Curated annotation (Swiss-Prot):
Organism, as annotated: Bacillus cytotoxicus (strain DSM 22905 / CIP 110041 / 391-98 / NVH 391-98)
Tagged with keyword Cytoplasm: yes
Cofactor binding, per record: Binds 1 zinc ion.
Keyword Zinc-finger: no
Protein name: Protein SprT-like
Length: 154
């Protein structure tokens, strides 16, 4: 499915379920990782997560589109468009849109960890973020710290 097809699908869903036209752009955003889609307030555009479409299919994508269109139409009308607003929850129920999308499975991307060791007391620190060993010292004895290992856990 490409951006033209997604634009057409969003326009059809908007007319069918909301009886109002969608007058802005709907696209896939390949950079989205943790959310099914997002409604951009400034531009009124809708961005959808391609990975959800690939993983869960068209039905889940339609649910996400309905959810984002709830944000869109309520914002355009000047009503409460945020998740906590009553207008938003009522419209979700009316169009049978999910309040939350399914969770994405844990990424198969390996977790990188860094292992540091104090030169004085031999205490080991395991960290996800790299640290500047010239700037930081051991929290126990104030000794120098050296990096002893960099591992890629999978």
């Amino acid at each position: 499915m490409n951006d033209k097809e997604i634009q057409r699908l969003v326009e059809e869903i908007s007319l069918r379920y909301f009886e109002m036209p969608f007058l802005h752009r709907a696209t896939f955003n390949m950079r989205l990782r943790t959310t099914g889609g997002r409604y951009v307030l400034k531009s009124h555009n809708i961005e959808l997560n391609y990975h959800y479409y690939k993983l869960y299919g068209r039905e889940e994508l339609i649910g996400i589109i309905k959810h984002e269109l709830c944000h869109y139409h309520l914002h355009i009308e000047g009503k409460g468009y945020q998740h906590r607003d009553r207008d938003f929850r009522q419209l979700l129920e009316k169009v049978d849109a999910p309040r939350f999308c399914k969770r994405m499975p844990v990424s198969n991307k390996g977790e990188r960890t860094y292992v540091y060791e104090c030169v004085e007391c031999s205490f080991q620190y395991v960290r996800r973020r790299q640290m500047n060993i010239r700037k930081y010292v051991c929290g126990r004895c104030k000794g120098k710290v050296k990096q002893i290992e960099k591992r890629l856990d999978s």
